[in-house]
């Protein structure tokens, strides 16, 4: 199984409000970047969407080292998700996104690590800027 590194971040202008997501996917020297956004969303939804979109970009099963500044995403993946499934996601927010994450992550082995945001981590800073730009673009387009 290939070992890939996935850096992800989300941004939301208002919570809820216009939001953006971004990821950087790296395997050896190869790298892929992408970003997008939504007109009405939350910061947690965009953080999770960034990870989902990064996983969707993978073309084969991989061992994924996910780096996120969202403790919500990191803790959910590493600790809470299994119990949420057992409880049928009772009282869990963003169920549809978590179910999408579970489906897309099935072929992969994902380990999430939390990194402090806005602390000089180059890939996190780049993802943050990309996600924020998407949120600003959507805000301007929709005059939110």
From Swiss-Prot:
Primary enzyme class: hydrolase
Gene: rnhA
Function statement: Endonuclease that specifically degrades the RNA of RNA-DNA hybrids.
Annotated RNase H type-1 domain residues: 1-136
Localisation per UniProt entry: Cytoplasm
Protein name: Ribonuclease H
Cofactor note: Binds 1 Mg(2+) ion per subunit. May bind a second metal ion at a regulatory site, or after substrate binding.
Cofactor(s) the record lists: Mg(2+)
Alphabetic keyword roster: Cytoplasm, Endonuclease, Hydrolase, Magnesium, Metal-binding, Nuclease
Chief localisation class: cytoplasm
InterPro entries: RNase_H, RNaseH-like_sf, RNaseH_domain, RNaseH_sf, RNaseHI
Residues that hold Mg(2+) 1 according to the record: 9, 47, 69
GO-annotated biological processes: DNA replication, removal of RNA primer
Top-level taxonomy: Bacteria, Pseudomonadati, Campylobacterota, Epsilonproteobacteria, Campylobacterales
GO CC entries: cytoplasm
Keyword Magnesium: yes
Family affiliation: Belongs to the RNase H family.
Subunit structure: Monomer.
Keyword rRNA processing carried by entry: no
This enzyme's EC code(s): 3.1.26.4
GO molecular function annotations of the record: magnesium ion binding; nucleic acid binding; RNA-DNA hybrid ribonuclease activity
Catalyzed reactions: Endonucleolytic cleavage to 5'-phosphomonoester
Positions bound to Mg(2+) 2: 9, 128
């Amino acid at each position: 199984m290939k070992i890939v590194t996935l850096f992800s971040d989300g941004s939301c202008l208002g919570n809820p409000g216009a939001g953006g997501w971004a990821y950087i996917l790296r395997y050896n020297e190869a790298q892929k970047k992408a970003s997008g956004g939504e007109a009405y969303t939350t910061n947690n939804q965009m953080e999770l969407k960034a990870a989902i979109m990064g996983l969707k970009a993978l073309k084969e099963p991989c061992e994924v080292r996910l780096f996120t500044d969202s403790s919500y995403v990191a803790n959910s993946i590493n600790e809470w998700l299994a119990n949420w499934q057992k409880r049928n996601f009772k009282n869990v927010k963003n169920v549809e996104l978590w179910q999408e994450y579970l489906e897309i992550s099935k072929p992969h082995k994902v380990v999430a690590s939390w990194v402090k945001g806005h602390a000089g981590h180059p890939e996190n800073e780049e993802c943050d800027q990309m996600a924020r730009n998407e949120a600003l673009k959507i805000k301007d387009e929709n005059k939110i």
